[in-house]
Amino acid sequence: MTNSTIRIAVVGAGGRMGRQLIQAITQTKGVVLGAAVERAGSTLVGSDAGELAGTGLLNIAVSDDLSKVTDHFDVLIDFTRPEGTLEHLAICRAHHKAMVIGTTGFDDAGKAAISAASAEIGIVFAANFSVGVNVVLKLLEKAAKVMGDYTDIEIIEAHHRYKVDAPSGTALAMGEAIAESLGRSLKDCAVYTREGHTGERKPGTIGFATVRAGDIVGEHTAMFADIGERVEITHKATSRMTFANGAVKSAIWLSNHDNGLFDMRDVLSLNEL
């Protein structure tokens, strides 16, 4: 990217996260909203993106086709759903546009497609764009190295009633951070939502529990429990703006990377700690 001002496009512009992303872009120096996209047939198509997000008139009409606005942005921010994100990925790859991906729930094939595209374009792909959550992931790596071999590890997450995937991408990222520190594969040691006569807890496993209720933005706790004591590392989000601001920060950071697959820990230089 050669422009001093980074042009950002937002897909899913009319959703809760999309509106917050537009707000974050308008409040951040060095970036502008270049395009806003909604699904074909949406009643929001043609409306002004700024008025939609409550930031005032921006003179950017919401489009129903990302491929028609590729000349208007440098980086795409996508917090939609896996099938839509993969369609957007193909368009960005064809037009050499960077991507910030906050969509969760990808299967292995979807993750492989993202990895393959990163050979040609810059991608920041993260389960959570909160600075706090990514600090927590680093703390979990450290805690697991000290306590992980002898404690019972459980991850509990809670989100609003509208979230469609479980466990959350952040909960899985927490589990992966712990498992990797212990030299394990999360696929081999994860236990999801126990029910019925489960028998005693198996050593070396990582348990997951999920809550879906009300308007909870996002709460995650990792527990390292031993006999006589336990350590809990918790993050609670109270506003989606923390994710939106992190995504915009990632878009700015990507301006210095023509290709490659990164996560929020790269953006925050946490991998250097």
Swiss-Prot record:
The keyword Oxidoreductase applies. (S)-2,3,4,5-tetrahydrodipicolinate binds at residues 160, 169-170. Its EC number is 1.17.1.8. One of its GO terms (molecular function) is NAD binding. The keyword Transcription regulation does not apply. It comes from the Bacteria. It is found in: Cytoplasm. One of its GO terms (cellular component) is cytosol. NADP(+) binds at residue 39. It catalyses: (S)-2,3,4,5-tetrahydrodipicolinate + NAD(+) + H2O = (2S,4S)-4-hydroxy-2,3,4,5-tetrahydrodipicolinate + NADH + H(+); (S)-2,3,4,5-tetrahydrodipicolinate + NADP(+) + H2O = (2S,4S)-4-hydroxy-2,3,4,5-tetrahydrodipicolinate + NADPH + H(+). Pfam families: DapB_C, DapB_N. Catalyzes the conversion of 4-hydroxy-tetrahydrodipicolinate (HTPA) to tetrahydrodipicolinate. HAMAP family: DapB. Homotetramer. This is 4-hydroxy-tetrahydrodipicolinate reductase.
